[in-house]
Each structure stands twice: as C-alpha cells, then as structure tokens.
C-alpha cells in the first residue's frame, strides 16, 4: 500500500520530486521547508519557497521550523507517524533523533555520483572541475555529510554546452523519477543499500562570489567550464574598457573557438577571447543591471574591437 511520507525540501530543484511522489499515490502527510524570506520590489513581502507554494496548491500541511533540534520539533515530527521522509535540498541539518523517527528511515536525493562532490554545490563543482558525467543518487541518510548508504543511482553525461542551470534542470527531472522508483522499492521491501566507496571522496564547497572572476590565463576548456559552472548564478564575470568606460560583463554561455593572442584579448568581431592555449567565443552575456542577452544582440549596440582586453 502507498507510503505515508514527510517531504522536506526548499528550492525549485525539489519541486518535481514532490509532484511525482504526490502523483504516484503516496500520502504526503506534511511538507517541511524553509521559512518565507523578504522579497518583492522593496523587500517588504514575505516570499514562500517554491516547495511551500506547491505544497499549499496540493493542500498539504506546511511546516517551517527554524530548528529541528528541540523536543517540541521532534515531537511534532514523530506525530506524523510517517513511514519515511524524503529529503531534497532542504537546507537544514537533520539530527539523529529526526533521522530515527520515520519507521523506514529518511532518504535523500543528492545531485552527484557519491562519494564525489559531497556537500552544498555538487552541480557547479562537477562542471567547473571538467567532469565527464554527473548524476543523482538516493541514499538512506545518516548524520554525516552525504555519507549514507546508496539505494539507487542514475548517471548523466556532462557536455561542454551544459551550464549549471541546464544540468540542474535535467538532474531535477531524473531525480524525481529515481525517488519514485526508490519509494516503490521501499514499499515492496526490496530496496537494497550499498555503502559508499571509501576512495574518491571530494567536497563541493559552497560557491563564493570571489570565485566568479574569469582567469583568462587558463586553458580555454577550463575557462569554458568555469563560465558554465557558474551560470546563471553568481555568474562568471570580467571587465573590459569600451569608449573609456569600464564595463563589467557576466558571461553566461560560450563555446570553444580558434584564436590566439594575449590571454583576455578580443581576437575578432564576434567576441572571441584568447585564453592560454586557444580561445572561447561568448554567446550569451549580461551587462550590470540589464537582462541576459545574446552576444550578437549586444554587439549590434556596442562595438568591441579586436585588440581590446578583458581583465
């Protein structure tokens, strides 16, 4: 029979999993998410998380505790009498007492091929590191940082054209299907768990804005992966002086291109920029305070002459 589930998640990445579980007949008895944050044009309105919005649309009770470490929070969690909890980018550490509360445990959807890229930013780090593949895994949670036993996995190739946004969306959809399959196996009593490998562990540290500046002295492929790994947020950037004005541009998409010159130098009329070995051609960018735009549209209004230099 269908499982009684607690769902715990916050951002857009978690929404497909919530919708798929609800659509497959499981009884989602409560949704835990982060509290609404100030937003809107003046920051005066409280904006709910994407998960809260979807849960309320589905008529599921929503809880937004500041902590799960109090006796009151634990008692409330236990009172749901859930078979299992599904956790997708919740953003809060679950203490052992919470992990032990559901009859069959807590199951996390993680956007990497564990034990590679444990931590906060696995999608960004996989692209930035030049990884050939990524994926999603369902693991039974323990108190460690993404150290639980793995139940299921799905792999996905990373192409040079993929941005963090592209990979995020693909893994979100694949992960939703994977979690549905995992919960079906759990319901049947046939979910097999495998310990993570002890070697190959890497950590996906949170992305800092200080990392975003582009280093044109690196090889072109590394520059491309850096740009795509930070697109759209926080956005890899560089500055160039045009008509005496220093202009900061976020580079959102690019492609490998032919060209040589001093790193950072514009080598043609199509925004091809020299790197250490060859070049990249910018295809999408964003000027400060403006909307993202195709490079071709930018060049219609702004001349970036060969010989100018990004830095």
From Swiss-Prot:
EC class (word): transferase
GO cellular component: cytosol
Pfam families according to UniProt: Formyl_trans_C (PF02911), Formyl_trans_N (PF00551)
EC number(s) recorded for this UniProt protein: 2.1.2.9
Record-listed (6S)-5,6,7,8-tetrahydrofolate binding positions: 112-115
Reactions that this protein is recorded to catalyse: L-methionyl-tRNA(fMet) + (6R)-10-formyltetrahydrofolate = N-formyl-L-methionyl-tRNA(fMet) + (6S)-5,6,7,8-tetrahydrofolate + H(+)
Transmembrane segments: none
UniProt GO MF annotations: methionyl-tRNA formyltransferase activity
Secreted listed as a keyword: no
Keywords: Protein biosynthesis, Transferase
Listed InterPro entries: Fmt, Formyl_trans_C, Formyl_transf_N, Formyl_transf_N_sf, Formyl_transferase-like_C_sf, GART_AS, Met-tRNA-FMT_C, Met-tRNA-FMT_N
Family under the similarity heading: Belongs to the Fmt family.
Function: Attaches a formyl group to the free amino group of methionyl-tRNA(fMet). The formyl group appears to play a dual role in the initiator identity of N-formylmethionyl-tRNA by promoting its recognition by IF2 and preventing the misappropriation of this tRNA by the elongation apparatus.
Protein's name according to its UniProt entry: Methionyl-tRNA formyltransferase
Organism: Bradyrhizobium sp. (strain ORS 278)
Classification of source organism: Bacteria, Pseudomonadati, Pseudomonadota, Alphaproteobacteria, Hyphomicrobiales
């Amino acid at each position: 029979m269908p499982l009684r589930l607690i769902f715990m998640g916050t951002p857009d990445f978690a929404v497909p999993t919530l919708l798929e579980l609800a659509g497959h007949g499981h009884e989602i008895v409560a949704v835990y998410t982060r509290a609404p944050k100030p937003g809107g044009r003046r920051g005066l309105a409280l904006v709910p998380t994407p998960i809260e919005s979807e849960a309320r649309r589905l008529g599921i009770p929503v809880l937004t505790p500041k902590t799960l470490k109090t006796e009151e929070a634990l008692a409330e969690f236990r009172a749901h009498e859930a078979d299992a909890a599904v956790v997708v980018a919740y953003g809060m550490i679950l203490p052992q007492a919470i992990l032990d509360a559901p009859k069959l445990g807590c199951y996390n959807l993680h956007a990497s091929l564990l034990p590679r890229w444990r931590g906060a930013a696995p999608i960004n780090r996989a692209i930035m590191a030049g990884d050939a593949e990524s994926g999603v895994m369902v693991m039974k949670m323990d108190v460690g940082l993404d150290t639980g036993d793995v139940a299921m996995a799905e792999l996905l190739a990373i192409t040079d054209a993929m941005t963090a946004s592209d990979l995020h969306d693909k893994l979100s959809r694949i992960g939703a299907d994977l979690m549905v399959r995992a919960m079906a196996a759990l319901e049947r009593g046939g979910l097999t768990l495998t310990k993570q490998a002890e070697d190959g562990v890497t950590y996906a540290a949170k992305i800092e804005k200080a990392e975003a500046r582009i280093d044109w002295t690196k090889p072109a492929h590394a520059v491309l992966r850096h740009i795509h790994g930070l697109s759209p947020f926080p956005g890899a950037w560089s500055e160039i002086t045009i008509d005496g004005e220093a202009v900061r541009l976020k580079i959102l998409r690019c492609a490998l291109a032919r060209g040589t010159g001093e790193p950072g130098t514009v080598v043609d009329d199509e925004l091809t920029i020299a790197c250490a070995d060859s070049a990249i051609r910018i295809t999408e960018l964003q000027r400060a305070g403006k909307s993202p735009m195709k490079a071709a549209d930018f060049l219609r209004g702004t001349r970036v002459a060969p010989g100018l230099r990004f830095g």
